[in-house]
């Protein structure tokens, strides 16, 4: 039993303790720097969006339709919260917003802006801006944790946020909202890396809650990405239990 505990304590899945608080790429200063960097990168890549948030849409195809639906979800959240996907489309059919891509999560996130301004264009643009910004930051957060490198996180974040595939979806808000699956994966990584101990610490369970919250949020923001993140999480779980945890690898030796 002692050998087993020693193995788990020193297994690859157990994070090592480092005192990096004084380094530029570590701690709260690094978080602030990364957030600022990806905010500026998003301004550059989406220009002139930031100076036309109130009255600009990328095109006249999907964006006006999505913006209108976001407004309906925000109104329903106040006046008809049990029927968030209800609108006049295809009356008398109910929940017609849900016939297309799932927008429930985005509508809830954008609701406070709509309540304050009544401007669905502003809601659409802020959510669109945030999707690029947080896509970069979420990938930076994950890669910086896995590699310990601030620069590697920046590079990975730029690729994830502004790759031709993602940037090409600029006018399709549900498909730009890919950031939550990476936050979800980050929470899962931190949860599985928590030291094996009894009883579990509160922080351990907070990481599990972090994972579940963002997993569900991603599914509510884009139904397509619910399948993407299920595959992503499944692949990571297979990798972790086969190679990092030592639970399977030890048996092979």
Show where each model-derived region lies.
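Membrane-interface coil-to-helix junctions
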Residues: 41-135, 163-178
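Membrane-interfacial entry segments at the cytosolic side of transmembrane helices
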Residues: 28-29, 202-206, 246-253
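Generic alpha-helical secondary structure signal
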Residues: 35, 100-111, 153, 157, ...
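Transmembrane helix-loop junctions in multipass membrane proteins, especially transporters and channels
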Residues: 50-54, 119, 194-198, 241-252
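Basic polycationic patches enriched in arginine
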Residues: 4, 198-200
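Membrane-embedded helix bundles of polyisoprenyl
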Residues: 38, 127-195, 203-245
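Start-transfer (signal-anchor) and selected internal transmembrane alpha helices
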Residues: 1-47
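Membrane-interface starts of transmembrane alpha-helices
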Residues: 29-33, 115, 119-127, 148-156
């Amino acid at each position: 039993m002692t050998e087993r505990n020693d193995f788990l304590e020193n297994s690859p899945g157990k994070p090592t303790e480092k005192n990096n608080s004084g380094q530029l790429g570590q701690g709260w200063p690094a978080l602030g720097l990364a957030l600022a960097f990806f905010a500026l990168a998003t301004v550059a890549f989406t220009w002139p969006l930031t100076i036309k948030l109130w009255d600009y849409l990328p095109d006249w195809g999907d964006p006006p339709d999505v913006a209108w639906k976001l407004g309906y979800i925000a109104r329903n959240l106040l006046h008809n919260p049990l029927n968030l996907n209800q609108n006049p489309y295809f009356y008398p059919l109910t929940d017609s917003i849900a016939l297309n891509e799932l927008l429930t999560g985005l509508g809830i996130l954008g609701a406070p802006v709509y309540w304050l301004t009544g401007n669905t264009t502003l809601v659409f643009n802020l959510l669109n801006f945030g999707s690029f910004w947080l896509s970069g930051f979420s990938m930076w957060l994950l890669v910086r944790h896995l590699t310990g490198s601030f620069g590697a996180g920046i590079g990975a974040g730029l690729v994830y946020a502004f790759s031709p595939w993602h940037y090409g979806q600029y006018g399709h808000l549900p498909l730009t909202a890919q950031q939550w699956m990476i936050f979800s994966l980050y929470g899962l990584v931190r949860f599985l890396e928590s030291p094996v101990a009894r009883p579990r610490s509160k922080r351990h369970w907070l990481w599990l809650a972090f994972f579940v919250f963002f997993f569900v949020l991603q599914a509510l923001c884009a139904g397509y990405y619910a399948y993407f993140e299920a595959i992503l999480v499944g692949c990571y779980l297979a990798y972790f239990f086969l190679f990092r945890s030592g639970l399977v690898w030890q048996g092979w030796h």
